Amino acid sequence: YQQSLAERGYKADEAQLKGIAALQRCQDEWSHYKAKRGNALTKMLRYPDLPKGVYMYGGVGRGKSFIMDCFFNAVPLERKTRLHFHEFMREVHRQLHELKGVQDPLEVLAKRMSRKHRLICFDEFHVADVTDAMILYKLLDAMFRNRMSIVTTSNFHPDGLYPNGLHRDRILPAIELLKQQLQVVNVD
């Protein structure tokens, strides 16, 4: 982070330091996780707990994406990806269409994703579509049960997702799950 700031001529921001501290904790936990997973005895006995993810929110232009990119580049993990949340949901809908008729397609989809990625970094987590709101809880729950960790940026606190949206009650369990599974950090 410090190196990237200097290279770009940016100045450190006090509010960003809360996000950086949360991401540093997450990165440290990933380093510890990798060390535990490297132990053959541990591999046979049980999986160590995955690092707790981070939900970093704040206004436009607060540097959330920049901070997350620094984290993504530094985290010692090969099975990771970073993408825009809208792009991710578009791909989810495409794959759900392919899985039409399959029992519990969101579980199948989460298992597929977990084979490729342990960590997913979402930029601009935002729900604007009723269809997304309706499937989000089952999708996130399946991802967490399939041992995936999430780090995300958003312009909104989780409670502010999909305000006044059609069938907003359908997204409330997903919001609670996000708050339970991720460390929520305000960078304003």
Q: What is each residue range found by the language model?
A:
Residues 67, 71, 84:
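Hydrophobic positions on the alpha1 helix immediately C-terminal to the Walker A/P-loop
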Residues 80-117:
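Short glycine-rich substrate-engagement loop in P-loop NTPases that contacts/grips substrate
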Residues 29, 34-36, 42-51:
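Phosphate-binding P-loop
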Residues 64:
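Conserved lysine of the Walker
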Residues 73-81:
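Post-Walker A helix-loop "phosphate-sensing" segment adjacent to the P-loop in P-loop NTPases
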Residues 61:
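Walker A (P-loop) phosphate-binding loop of P-loop NTPases
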Residues 53-57:
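Short hydrophobic/aromatic beta-strand immediately N-terminal to the Walker A/P-loop
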